[in-house]
């Protein structure tokens, strides 16, 4: 498990080191930048001859530092008032020459953290905390998969404008495809008629797909290409309304 985790971390940061890192504005009027990368310092310090090695060393000193950097990443950009119910996620976008075989690294890091927490429990406590043993089920059935920009074609950005999602991103040695890890309600699941575990005598329930913002390379209606935050499907939640007349 530890060896697999180490391999994923090294591969992930190798991709970050190979990807272009230039200044980019949120609304897409800047230059090309790697999505989801948290930059430190000035632009000159990022584009110097040793910028990639410095960033790689500072982030990969220990497993704990890597987890802290990715799980506690802070976003200062806020959605507009119209889209204030949406969150910001940058880990659901990946640049790759082929369809990714695993969920985003941040998801795997969370699973690894849970694995470490479970390792510190006694066998009895571990069995008791296992959701499968307690009979726990999700309120709404969902499905997750990687989709390409060719499947999305268009999306809504943070200003509410419809933009074109570009299928390929230029990199120094060619082009990579943009992949988005989307989560939505499962139309073939057992909760398509309502949320699981809800008292239907008193409540109307519905499983609904919600969206969050991720950073992607897009083009607006004025043919301006840049990195913008767009909305994609990221979760399936239960919505409730009380039944009247009871």
UniProtKB/Swiss-Prot annotation:
GO terms for cellular component: axon; cytoplasm; dendrite; extracellular space; nucleus; perinuclear region of cytoplasm; synaptic vesicle. SUPFAM superfamilies: Cystine-knot cytokines (SSF57501). InterPro entries: Brain-der_neurotrophic_factor, Cystine-knot_cytokine, Nerve_growth_factor-like, Nerve_growth_factor-rel, Nerve_growth_factor_CS. It is found in: Secreted. GO terms for molecular function: growth factor activity; nerve growth factor receptor binding. Glycans are attached at residue 120. Residues 19-127 form a propeptide. Coiled coil: none annotated. PANTHER family: BRAIN-DERIVED NEUROTROPHIC FACTOR (PTHR11589:SF3), NERVE GROWTH FACTOR NGF -RELATED (PTHR11589). Important signaling molecule that activates signaling cascades downstream of NTRK2. During development, promotes the survival and differentiation of selected neuronal populations of the peripheral and central nervous systems. Participates in axonal growth, pathfinding and in the modulation of dendritic growth and morphology. Major regulator of synaptic transmission and plasticity at adult synapses in many regions of the CNS. This is Neurotrophic factor BDNF precursor form. It comes from Gallus gallus (Chicken).
